[in-house]
Curated annotation (Swiss-Prot):
InterPro entries: AAA+_ATPase, ATPase_AAA_core, DNA_pol3_clamp-load_cplx_C, DNA_Rep/Repair_Clamp_Loader, P-loop_NTPase, Rep_factor-C_ssu_arc, Rep_factorC_C, RFC_lid. This is Replication factor C small subunit. CDD domains: AAA (cd00009), HLD_clamp_RFC (cd18140). It holds the Pfam family AAA. Heteromultimer composed of small subunits (RfcS) and large subunits (RfcL). SMART domains: AAA. ATP binds at G43, S44, P45, G46, V47, G48, K49, T50. It comes from the Archaea. Keywords: ATP-binding, DNA replication, Nucleotide-binding. GO terms for cellular component: DNA replication factor C complex. Belongs to the activator 1 small subunits family. RfcS subfamily. Part of the RFC clamp loader complex which loads the PCNA sliding clamp onto DNA. One of its GO terms (biological process) is DNA-templated DNA replication.
Length: 315
């Protein structure tokens, strides 16, 4: 059975990692010196945090990396018992081979409970001579300050367009795909700097056709073209509520989009709208209110229709 492309084309070593050149340079220095502090990787999903941790372990340990590296997903195992059992049992044993220390990688560590984080802090202190921790999180503010102060913090930003394009073209060439310019632009738009999402969309589109086009990408990603969103917002802003609502329903039915997806795309269009700064502020407030109501369980169609109605009377 074929691997998902995100795993098939995951970089094996630090020099292969796409983007984040300054971060990779610092991690490479740790490998060369065989010495490093505890690390905290923060950033949005799909920007290379897990890949960097795995590549670091493989470069540091070589063939014995599996014996000296433990990966746990904290969103699945987020309680204090995991820290007291799995983490502590692995941390207290000596490294295999000539490795100076073991590495424990806690993915999504911002999901750990407060008690678990306090237990982790004590474990980090107790076994710091033979074990290093790499913590990965989306929201560093959810990591308690005592842990943050014990780590070197690396902030992974969304990947640049040129890095995404280069990697997508490389994968397309290896998979003998024809990647059209419109297809690339569409993947860049829907992925928003998330390499994992970009590769998944490319693989899904490739299952439909060997030629990846703009239309196919938006279909498989369940996203509307930016011009479809622009058309709806312009109709609403010009007071054409009925036509705007019809466009909204077409997006939800024809494209299978959720209200949240449409709201995010409308929000992304706000800076480009030909309205005053004051009107943009009021529009963002209305979008925020609509988002809150949808998250709380209100009917998506009613809330989005109300948003379109408000857009027609912006002051």
């Amino acid at each position: 059975m074929q691997k998902p492309w995100v795993e098939k084309y995951r970089p094996e070593t630090l020099p292969e990692v796409v983007g984040h050149h300054e971060i990779i340079k610092r991690l490479t220095n740790y490998v060369e010196k065989k010495s490093m502090p505890h690390l905290l990787f923060s950033g949005s999903p799909g920007v290379g945090k897990t890949t960097a941790a795995l590549a670091l372990a493989k470069d540091l340990y070589g063939e014995t990396w599996r014996e000296n590296f433990l990966e746990l997903n904290s969103s699945d195992e987020r309680g204090i018992d995991v820290i007291r059992t799995k983490v502590k049992d692995f941390a207290r044993t000596k490294p295999i081979g000539d490795a100076p220390f073991k590495v424990i990688f806690l993915d999504e560590s911002d999901a750990l409970t407060s008690d678990a984080q306090n237990a982790l802090r004590r474990t980090m202190e107790k076994y710091s001579d033979i074990c290093r921790f790499i913590l990965s999180c989306n929201y560093p503010s959810k990591i308690i300050p005592p842990i943050q102060s014990r780590c070197a913090i690396f902030r992974f930003s969304p990947l640049k367009t040129e890095d995404l394009v280069e990697n997508l073209k490389d994968i397309s060439e290896k998979e003998t795909l024809t990647l059209e310019k419109g297809g690339i632009d569409a993947i860049i738009y829907v992925s928003e700097g998330d390499m994992r999402k970009a590769i998944n969309v490319l693989q899904t589109a490739a299952a439909v056709s060997d030629t990846v086009t703009e239309e196919i990408v938006y279909k498989v990603a369940s996203k509307a073209r930016p011009d479809e969103i622009k058309k709806m917002t312009h109709l609403a802003l010009n007071g054409k509520f009925v036509e705007a609502k019809e466009q909204l329903y077409n997006l939800m039915i024809d494209w299978g989009m959720s209200g949240e997806d449409i709201l995010i795309q409308v929000f992304r269009e706000v800076p480009n709208l030909d309205i005053s700064e004051k009107e943009k502020v009021h529009l963002v407030e209305a979008i925020g209110e609509c988002d809150f109501r949808i998250v709380e369980g209100s009917n998506e169609r009613i809330q989005l229709s109300a948003l379109l109605a408000k857009m027609g009377i912006l002051e």
